[in-house]
Amino acid sequence: MVVAPYLAVAIGGSLGAMSRYLVTIMAQNAWGIKFPYGTLLVNTLGSFLAGFFLIVLVGRFSAEESFRLFLFTGFLGAFTTFSSFAAESLFMFEQGYWFKLITNILVNNVGSLSMVFVGTLVAKYVLLGHQGSN
């Protein structure tokens, strides 16, 4: 058994989970707890980073498998959180917070998908900018 892939995922996951917790606490301190801003922020930021690094590390620079496992499966897998999104949405449903529920579902889904796309565009722009200066 090769330990490196498991270790890469474990370290990335640990850092991603701690980062998610930190971002969530910062969002609660900044905007309060009436809406799950922390979950929205980690999901959209994580989606942007996934799109960006998909182009930069996988498409352009062919990053090592262990680093891809560290970043995508470990860090971004733990940083973003579909389970928290689902649980918070269920709570809003059970409480009858219909506007918050619909907003949460739409903004998380549309926002996350959009941010993956924006991340790929930014990465391509950055790469083309570097190619043009050579």
Curated annotation (Swiss-Prot):
Question: Where does the chain bind Na(+)?
Answer: G77, T80
What are the record keywords, sorted? Cell inner membrane, Cell membrane, Ion channel, Ion transport, Membrane, Metal-binding, Sodium, Transmembrane, Transmembrane helix, Transport
Spans through the membrane: 7-27, 38-58, 69-89, 110-130
Q: How is its activity regulated?
A: Na(+) is not transported, but it plays an essential structural role and its presence is essential for fluoride channel function.
Reaction(s) catalyzed by this protein? Answer: fluoride(in) = fluoride(out)
Main subcellular localization, coarse class?
membrane
The question of whether Cell membrane is a record keyword is answered with yes
Q: Which domain of life is it from?
A: Bacteria
* Pfam families noted in UniProt: CRCB
Might you name a Gene Ontology BP term for this protein?
A: cellular detoxification of fluoride
Question: What's its membrane topology?
Answer: Multi-pass membrane protein
GO MF annotation terms: fluoride channel activity; metal ion binding
Where located?
A: Cell inner membrane
Q: Name one GO cellular component term.
A: plasma membrane
Similarity annotation: Belongs to the fluoride channel Fluc/FEX (TC 1.A.43) family.
Q: What does this protein do?
A: Fluoride-specific ion channel. Important for reducing fluoride concentration in the cell, thus reducing its toxicity.
Tell me what this protein is called.
Fluoride-specific ion channel FluC
State the encoding gene.
fluC
